[in-house]
């Protein structure tokens, strides 16, 4: 049994598909495709899959990943890509299918590109000058202070007409002591 990573992009109206709905979409697409995927055992067997770093509702993406176990010994990755793209809903395109090189929970960094009105550029640039940005992180049980600069060291701005775009390379997993 091999674990396969399906990379896909989500654009336009597909960006409003939530994680739970995306799981349903992938389950249905994989069933319709007839590809040899592994199902869990038990009373309610379903396709076992793991999403790496899912985005919030309304966010477009150029690369999201889902890991799926296959029953095939040597899967034809190009066939998987073609079969999945043939039945994907509008706005979702499979860009790559490949064997997993690292587990989804080991992916530690993500790059986000965000657009803001150009009038806000000055405020965004002030972030880079700050030495410390303490942020309160709330959970169900408690609240703790996290240093944001450790996870988002700097913002890189580019002007795009009336808007300014900035890229964030951020640490996703915050290690707990």
Language-model regions: role of each:
Residues 2, 7-9, 13, 17, ...:
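Extended, well-folded interaction surfaces typified by the phenylalanyl-tRNA synthetase beta subunit core
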Residues 8-10, 68-74, 114-119, 168-170:
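Short beta-strand-to-loop capping motifs
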Residues 38-69, 101:
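Short, charge-patterned binding micro-sites
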Residues 47, 130-153, 159:
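Long, contiguous binding/interaction regions
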Residues 61-113:
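Ordered, amphipathic secondary-structure segments that act as subunit-interaction surfaces
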Residues 152-170:
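The conserved catalytic core of RNA pseudouridine synthases
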Residues 172-177:
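Residue-level detector of conserved catalytic or cofactor/ligand-binding positions
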């Amino acid at each position: 049994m091999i674990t396969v990573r399906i990379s896909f992009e989500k654009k336009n109206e597909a960006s409003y598909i939530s994680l739970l709905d995306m799981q349903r979409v992938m389950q249905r697409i994989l069933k319709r495709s007839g590809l040899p995927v592994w199902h869990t055992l038990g009373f309610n067997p379903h396709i076992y899959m793991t999403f790496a770093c899912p985005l919030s509702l309304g966010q477009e993406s150029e690369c999201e990943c889902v890991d799926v176990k296959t029953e095939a010994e040597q899967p034809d990755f190009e066939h998987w890509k073609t079969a999945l793209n043939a039945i994907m809903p509008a706005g979702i395109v499979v860009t790559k299918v490949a064997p997993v090189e690292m587990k989804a929970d080991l992916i530690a960094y993500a790059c986000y590109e965000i657009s803001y009105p150009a009038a806000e550029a000055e405020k965004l640039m002030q972030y880079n000058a700050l030495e410390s940005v303490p942020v309160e992180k709330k959970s169900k049980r408690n609240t703790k202070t996290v240093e944001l600069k450790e996870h988002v060291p700097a913002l890189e701005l580019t002007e795009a007409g009336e808007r300014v775009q900035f890229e964030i390379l951020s640490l996703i997993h915050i290690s707990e002591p």
